Amino acid sequence: MDVVDSLLVNGSNITPPCELGLENETLFCLDQPRPSKEWQPAVQILLYSLIFLLSVLGNTLVITVLIRNKRMRTVTNIFLLSLAVSDLMLCLFCMPFNLIPNLLKDFIFGSAVCKTTTYFMGTSVSVSTFNLVAISLERYGAICKPLQSRVWQTKSHALKVIAATWCLSFTIMTPYPIYSNLVPFTKNNNQTANMCRFLLPNDVMQQSWHTFLLLILFLIPGIVMMVAYGLISLELYQGIKFEASQKKSAKERKPSTTSSGKYEDSDGCYLQKTRPPRKLELRQLSTGSSSRANRIRSNSSAANLMAKKRVIRMLIVIVVLFFLCWMPIFSANAWRAYDTASAERRLSGTPISFILLLSYTSSCVNPIIYCFMNKRFRLGFMATFPCCPNPGPPGARGEVGEEEEGGTTGASLSRFSYSHMSASVPPQ
């Protein structure tokens, strides 16, 4: 079986007989065929089923919430909707057509399905990757260049970018339906079976294609995401440093705001004069109000710091998971393109199956990272499905759809958020 082919892997979990040879593609037996352990198919079925169900459920919920909730149709959420569609497409067109032929040792779905699945598989991976890049650039503009980015951070612009992403992906992946075909082979029990293979006319084209995919779907997107999220983290870290210095300065100014240790003004700008006793209650009331305002400012600052630290941690998780999910499969693709014999010998069977499973995991974790970790989305989910318990009272701060420009996590994180002090409590 070779349904996932060169985009997710140009290698087969089925080992053809030694005598079978094709022009421009070498198929061979392993030197020492590895016996299939009885527990491996069961583990494969269990893991594939788990990832499949989580991916379908998660992405379907994301699509449902974002479509049914008009107030959540923000710029960022439009990109998240496109990401959910592409991830759902990746799950539906890849996992069943990889697992079933792998278990049966035969691609039973026919030539038309072979061409269709490889095409939609390639398109879904491409769209998903481009969406992740678009989200990172959109967040960079919102946080690091808020004034300049307001010109192009509109829903209409987001829709144009998404349309261009899908059209570009469908165009790039046109070689798949053209060069994907069924390749017959004889199994060890002398029965004839088929593999779905993506075979370009010659080795140079095959290697060039793998290198091209490695660049546009892994290396370049990975670098762009690292740079964008790195700059965002630096911006937020500077905000954390600024707020820490403001807090330290406020503490240092506090002792100088007293007069003979009797009276203290809340803003520390002047010394309060002694007044007649009849106004003592008014001064005490003013001091109490100032204390409450100070507590609000302190809580606001602490909440801001915690929110920014959470964002930085989430951005690190995004980059790590992207490389963790996709590096093994793209490395295997490149290895097989330039050293087919060695790659087949070491990766055939269970190793490549679990490498593929790791790449499919991205379609399951993306909804969790980008949506379910966002309080606005969780509130939108509760509003879309009223049968679920509401996490807070009606009309509470942070209503559905009120997404701030700072990021998908709910923190107010614009470039100049640390250039002035505010007594308002930040959104969560």
Swiss-Prot record:
Q: Which GO terms describe its molecular function?
A: cholecystokinin receptor activity; peptide hormone binding
TM segment ranges: 42-67, 78-104, 116-137, 158-178, 211-234, 314-334, 350-373
What GO CC annotations are associated with the protein? cytosol; membrane; nucleoplasm; plasma membrane
The reply to whether Membrane figures as a keyword in the UniProt entry is: yes
What highest taxon heads this organism's lineage? Eukaryota
Q: What's a GO biological-process term for it? A: axonogenesis
Query: Could you tell me where the Polar residues compositional bias lies?
Result: 411-422
InterPro entries recorded: Cholcskin_rcpt, Cholcy_rcpt_A, CholecystokininA_recpt_N, CholecystokininA_recpt_N_sf, GPCR_Rhodpsn, GPCR_Rhodpsn_7TM
Membrane topology per record: Multi-pass membrane protein
| Residue intervals on the Extracellular side | 1-41, 105-115, 179-210, 335-349
At which residues does the record annotate a lipid attachment of kind S-palmitoyl cysteine? 387
Q: Which residues lie on this side of the membrane: Cytoplasmic?
A: 68-77, 138-157, 235-313, 374-428
| Keyword annotations | Cell membrane, Disulfide bond, G-protein coupled receptor, Glycoprotein, Lipoprotein, Membrane, Palmitate, Receptor, Transducer, Transmembrane, Transmembrane helix
Q: Where in the cell is it found?
A: Cell membrane
Chain intervals for the UniProt region annotation (Disordered): 248-272, 394-428
Using the UniProt record, give the first listed, main subcellular location. Answer: membrane
Glycosylation sites noted in the Swiss-Prot or TrEMBL record: 10, 24, 190
Q: List the disulfide bonds.
A: 18-29, 114-196
Keyword hit for Transmembrane helix: yes
- Annotated family: Belongs to the G-protein coupled receptor 1 family.
Q: What does this protein do?
A: Receptor for cholecystokinin. Mediates pancreatic growth and enzyme secretion, smooth muscle contraction of the gall bladder and stomach. Has a 1000-fold higher affinity for CCK rather than for gastrin. It modulates feeding and dopamine-induced behavior in the central and peripheral nervous system. This receptor mediates its action by association with G proteins that activate a phosphatidylinositol-calcium second messenger system.
What's the protein called, per UniProt? Cholecystokinin receptor type A
Give the species: Homo sapiens
